[in-house]
Amino acid sequence: MQAVKVFEVGPRDGLQNERQPLSVAARVGLIGELAGTGLRHIEAGAFVSPRWVPQMAGSDEVLRQLPSNDGVSYTALVPNRQGFEAAQRAGCREVAVFAAASEAFSRNNINCSIDESFERFTPVLRAANEASIRVRGYVSCVLGCPFSGAVAPEAVAKVARRLYELGCYEISLGDTIGAGRPDETAQLFELCARQLPVAALAGHFHDTWGMAIANVHAALAQGVRTFDSSVAGLGGCPYSPGASGNVATEDLLYLLHGLGYSTGVDLEAVAQVGVRISAQLGTANRSRAGLALAARSAREH
């Protein structure tokens, strides 16, 4: 049975796009619950300005309160050397950096060009290598940009390759606005797999147009075996009106297990976490599988 790695991004990418910020204690509790389901890769926070992203305030406290010997890799997003040093002080052993495949998105999101963004986080890669801290890379807008429209697959592959050559062990290709279709996804990953090992690629799909699970299936067919997901489908994109969150972890697990892949994650346990966090945030549970499991559980009890 082939294994697929599920990378849970709800506590960071999910929560930072929800209107209601959670306390440090609530975020630590959520992460602990997710780890208890068998998830072994969890994005726990971001060392960014609380002025711009108040939902991630106190990420240093969150990281410090997480166990260091439970077999789970807790990752934090860092935009620059300053953020990296803060993550390092908090005991973080894996960080993530992000770039965009679209010049327009890069300028609107982080106020610099793609080349300038690489100048910002190249020192992070250098310092992380010296400290034996792993670095994951994100590429935004791989299947479309909210400002400039279509994005050439060649532009995505170029950015992904640069991240890989700088030392990122894994490159997550993100459909930030959730507009991609399976045919485009297949073409993109086929092209990128010519530039760097497919084992170093991950899929990160938003569900704005209902294509996230279909895109996961298309990426699986191209040999991709790592996918980002968010419990209860938490999240969105502030630059894309109406954008939904990431593909729900529950929906991803339902697909993967049904296709015969092993994940080491308990689907029903994740669904229970999804119900609880949705209620806590006062938001709708966006996971189809999660809602179906909750309805079945209600009937049985």
UniProtKB/Swiss-Prot annotation:
Active site per the UniProt annotation: C237
EC category name: lyase
Keyword rRNA-binding: no
Cross-referenced Pfam families: HMGL-like
Gene Ontology MF terms in the entry: hydroxymethylglutaryl-CoA lyase activity; metal ion binding
Protein residues bound to substrate: R12
Disulfide linkage: none
Domain Pyruvate carboxyltransferase: start-end pairs: 4-271
Binding locations of a divalent metal cation: D13, H204, H206, N246
Pathway, per record: Metabolic intermediate metabolism; (S)-3-hydroxy-3-methylglutaryl-CoA degradation; acetoacetate from (S)-3-hydroxy-3-methylglutaryl-CoA: step 1/1
EC number: 4.1.3.4
Catalytic activity line of the entry: (3S)-3-hydroxy-3-methylglutaryl-CoA = acetoacetate + acetyl-CoA
Keyword annotations: Lyase, Metal-binding
Gene Ontology biological-process annotations: ketone body biosynthetic process; L-leucine catabolic process
Functional note: Involved in the catabolism of branched amino acids such as leucine.
NCBIfam families: PRK05692.1
Family, per entry: Belongs to the HMG-CoA lyase family.
Name of the protein this chain belongs to: Hydroxymethylglutaryl-CoA lyase
Species: Pseudomonas mevalonii
